[in-house]
Amino acid sequence: LHGRYADLQDGQVADYIPELAKADPDWFGICIATRDGHVYEVGDTRQVFTIQSISKALSYGLALEDRGEDFILSRVGVEPSGEAFNAISLKPETGAPFNPMINAGAIATCGQILEPSDQTRIQRILDYLSACAGRRLDVDAAVYQSESETGHRNRAIGWMLRNFGILNEEPTEVLETYFQQCAIRVTCRDLAVMGATLANQGRNPLTRELAVNPEVVDNVLSVMSTCGMYDFSGEWIYRVGLPAKSGVGGGILAVLPGQLGIGIFSPPLDAQGNSARGIKVCGDLSRDLALHQFANGSAPTPSLRLSYTGSQVTSCRRRPLTIQQTLRASGHRIRVHELQGELIF
């Protein structure tokens, strides 16, 4: 796959944030991390870039943990908007953003994260994302400064949220935290491990640390499924069928729940703001490996090969005489099932 799309010239590197325009359009990495801790990677998987909007999915999880589902749903919806990620639009009846994956929803979400006396919000967000990645992450100061200096549209969104009471404080500090959150430095490998952490019900498969509360993982993956790929989300779930989140830094994080996480990095973006190579790679992976969540697959075959009692077989292991006597006397109470194939419950 890497060789297939390395020469693809589609897309343009984001330039509305000056620091992002410095990215090399030839950078290209693919990484898959499984829930049991195996990592497979090719290309520029250790090249550092900024996480951008991919951070929205995980900060949403942190806000859910802090405030609870009912409170967050009263401030941020979960409906696809069908609009651009930076649209200045809120629900007319409530003033709430449509979902946490667009800028308005992410800024509102950021403002709900608790800030204890001994930690700032960005420190808590960094701790959370670092636990998901399995290593200590930091903020790219130059990108943060660039985002802050050009973030006039996001400031307009912030003041609208304050006007409707979605933010209960002046938006200036919340916005600076949001700009820093988007400027967190990651690699393609980090994204894959983050995805595998979500696939593994919140437990990082490399460090074994419980990074995300399992109670919010399904909520995060659900919103990623319906809203994670900007205004391409409908076609994405139709063709690829995986919860995912993209960022204008060129990253894509995708998750096959219960199985694996996928991280892709390639800076040139398509018209919707998604990595052009990343979209192609994910489509091929989904098709070639049958990863689509809603694919029926082939007709299931019976998984039960044999069924018998313990009295019908003898143990190959050398055991003390007393245990042998117990097994002979009680073998009929042991049921052995030999299974092979896919188990569907």
Task: Please tell me what each predicted stretch does.
Residues 1-3, 8-10, 63-181, 189, ...:
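Active-site-adjacent helix/loop patches that line small-molecule binding or acyl-intermediate pockets
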Residues 5-42, 253-254:
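A short, well-structured edge-of-sheet supersecondary motif
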Residues 20-23, 98-99, 149, 183, ...:
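Short Gly/Pro-enriched turn/cap motifs at secondary-structure boundaries
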Residues 36-37, 50-72, 194, 262:
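Active-site SXXK
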Residues 46-48:
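A short acidic/small-residue loop/turn micro-motif
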Residues 57, 185-204, 219, 256-267:
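Active-site-proximal alpha-helical segments within enzyme catalytic domains
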Residues 206-279, 284, 288-314:
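Conserved SxxK-family serine transpeptidase/carboxypeptidase catalytic domain
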Residues 292-345:
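The feature marks cytosolic C-terminal regulatory regions of anion transporters and related permeases
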